[in-house]
């Protein structure tokens, strides 16, 4: 029997958090907020299957994310998903599969599956201390950007996201959207909708945020949350391009003020954008969190 998949709602947060806590991961997709916000833009639904959390992408041929839960529950869920695909006469496929996930599959089903990693989806993981201090020769250029910002904008200030400034951040985000052609680009528009909803629901989603000002004017903000016990994930970062150094400044200040209780910071993937990839690599990630797509060897079975 095919389980009933539903779109995640705010009232599902406790349930989904419960399953994510059973299988901690440094993959940026493994938070309720990420699932909830992006399900508004894409056809992703969830179900509980054999006591494992399963997401299904209904816009991409009914593929499934690697199940979340304890190992025995994950294996039972995988068996059921394979049977569902067989009954529906469709190819079995899993997305968002980490090397650790695939290693477990190889143990259960040796030689039956292949994985193809997508470099565009790999998350950049950094040492928190290095992002905060920017110490060392390799990050000298980043320190220069910070110093330049301080010289150009001596009235700058940093503050945590709060009820007192969230509406001003929302208005800044609207200006950013209008000046960056988001209305004419479906991908940019979807990402902007996620940004706006992140601000609107920052308390309900358990977000921390940071705000950068030049005088009274907000020139940058960022939003993120705990991913697992040793890793914080930054979901959103917006700055005005004409404010020189605003991006590196909000990055550094946010980590220094909000993330020092964590060993690592996940700054998500680069989506294959060359400029974004160059920038993320320039901060010297300690490793990349790889994710891939799994299919059966030999196709449908």
Features from the language model and the residues they span:
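Short, extreme N-terminal leader segments that mark the start of a protein/domain
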Residues: 1-21, 292, 298-301
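Conserved donor-binding loop and adjoining core beta-sheet/short helix segment
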Residues: 18, 29-100, 213-243
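Short, glycine/charge-rich beta-strand/loop segments that flank catalytic centers
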Residues: 90-108, 119-122
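Short catalytic-loop micro-motif centered on adjacent basic/acidic residues
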Residues: 93-94, 159, 264-267
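Conserved active-site alpha-helix within GNAT-family acetyltransferase domains
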Residues: 101-115, 144, 271-288
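Acyltransferase donor/substrate-recognition loop-hinge adjacent to the catalytic core
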Residues: 110-183
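Short, conserved active-site entrance elements at the starts or edges of catalytic domains
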Residues: 164-217
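Aromatic (often tryptophan-rich) hydrophobic motifs at membrane interfaces
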Residues: 207-297
């Amino acid at each position: 029997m095919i389980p009933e998949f539903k779109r995640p709602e705010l009232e599902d947060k406790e349930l989904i958090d419960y399953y994510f806590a059973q299988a901690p991961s440094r993959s940026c997709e493994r938070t309720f907020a990420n699932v909830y916000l992006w399900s508004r833009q894409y056809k992703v639904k969830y179900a509980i299957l054999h006591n494992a959390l399963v997401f299904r992408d209904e816009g991409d041929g009914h593929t499934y994310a690697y199940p979340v839960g304890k190992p025995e529950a994950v294996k039972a869920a995988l068996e059921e998903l394979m049977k569902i695909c067989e009954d529906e006469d469709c190819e079995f496929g899993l997305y968002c599969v980490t090397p650790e996930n695939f290693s477990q599959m190889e143990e259960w089903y040796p030689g039956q599956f292949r994985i193809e990693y997508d470099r565009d989806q790999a998350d950049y993981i950094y040492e928190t201390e290095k992002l905060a201090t920017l110490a060392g020769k390799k990050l000298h250029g980043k320190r220069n950007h910070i110093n330049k910002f301080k010289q150009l904008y001596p009235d700058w200030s940093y503050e945590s996201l709060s009820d007192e400034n969230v509406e001003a951040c929302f208005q800044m985000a609207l200006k950013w959207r209008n000046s960056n052609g988001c209305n004419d680009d479906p991908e940019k528009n979807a990402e902007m909708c996620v940004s706006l909803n992140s601000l609107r629901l920052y308390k309900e989603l358990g977000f921390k945020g940071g705000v950068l000002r030049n005088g009274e004017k907000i020139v940058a903000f960022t939003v993120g949350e705990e991913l697992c016990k040793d890793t914080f994930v930054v979901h959103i970062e917006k700055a005005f391009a004409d404010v020189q150094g605003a991006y590196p400044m909000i990055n550094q200040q946010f980590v220094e003020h909000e993330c020092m209780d964590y060993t690592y910071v996940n700054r998500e993937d680069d989506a294959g954008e060359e400029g974004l990839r160059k920038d993320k690599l320039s901060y010297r990630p300690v490793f990349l969190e790889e994710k891939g797509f799994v299919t059966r060897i030999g196709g449908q079975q």
